[in-house]
């Protein structure tokens, strides 16, 4: 966790910290804290309750600091919980700043919906990004017949909501999204633009230097 109690994306190496000097003295910081100072949120883990709470808190804090400046969310995530996805999604739509979304690596399942939910014209992929969309995953269900019926209705509700959400942000019909997500649909960066999940593929900064 960082100094604010937020969980940082897990790394297979030691996360470096460094000393930063300013007119007010010195302080120890780390890459994720520096990104936050630049109004950048990094989703680099599975979408679950913990990561959702962290991201929602950062969105709300950044809105309070400056409601008129964009927030950028970088995404490299295999997806995860549908309820956690919708919690982040609602917060992205709720806050006043535009939320830019950028995929680097992959945006799969729930993370693909978050990628598409960025502000119109402000959604992008890096060239070798991978985007995967499919219907919400469900765990094995058990219980009484009446409970199974309730669970089946909830599964269908979640699927319909996800389809409507993707349709809203891609310009596709909900019916087309249902067909496309019946099985895994894997998109390259260029295909994600064609589908309407993002608006552009970023060039490497070195090429523009």
Swiss-Prot record:
InterPro entries documented for this protein: ClpP, ClpP/crotonase-like_dom_sf, ClpP/TepA, ClpP_His_AS, ClpP_Ser_AS
UniProt-annotated location(s): Cytoplasm
Highest taxon listed in the record's lineage: Bacteria
One Pfam assignment: CLP_protease
Residue ranges the record marks as coiled coil: none
Keyword Hydrolase: yes
Active site: 109 (nucleophile), 134
GO molecular function: ATP-dependent peptidase activity; ATPase binding; serine-type endopeptidase activity
GO cellular component: cytoplasm; endopeptidase Clp complex
PROSITE patterns hit by this protein: CLP_PROTEASE_HIS (PS00382), CLP_PROTEASE_SER (PS00381)
Keyword flag Cytoplasm: yes
Signal peptide (from-to): none
EC code: 3.4.21.92
Catalytic activity: Hydrolysis of proteins to small peptides in the presence of ATP and magnesium. alpha-casein is the usual test substrate. In the absence of ATP, only oligopeptides shorter than five residues are hydrolyzed (such as succinyl-Leu-Tyr-|-NHMec, and Leu-Tyr-Leu-|-Tyr-Trp, in which cleavage of the -Tyr-|-Leu- and -Tyr-|-Trp bonds also occurs)
Family: Belongs to the peptidase S14 family.
Assembly and binders: Fourteen ClpP subunits assemble into 2 heptameric rings which stack back to back to give a disk-like structure with a central cavity, resembling the structure of eukaryotic proteasomes.
PANTHER family given in the database record: ATP-DEPENDENT CLP PROTEASE PROTEOLYTIC SUBUNIT, ATP-DEPENDENT CLP PROTEASE PROTEOLYTIC SUBUNIT-LIKE-RELATED
NCBIfam families xrefs: PRK00277.1, PRK12553.1
Name of protein: ATP-dependent Clp protease proteolytic subunit 1
Biological source species: Corynebacterium diphtheriae (strain ATCC 700971 / NCTC 13129 / Biotype gravis)
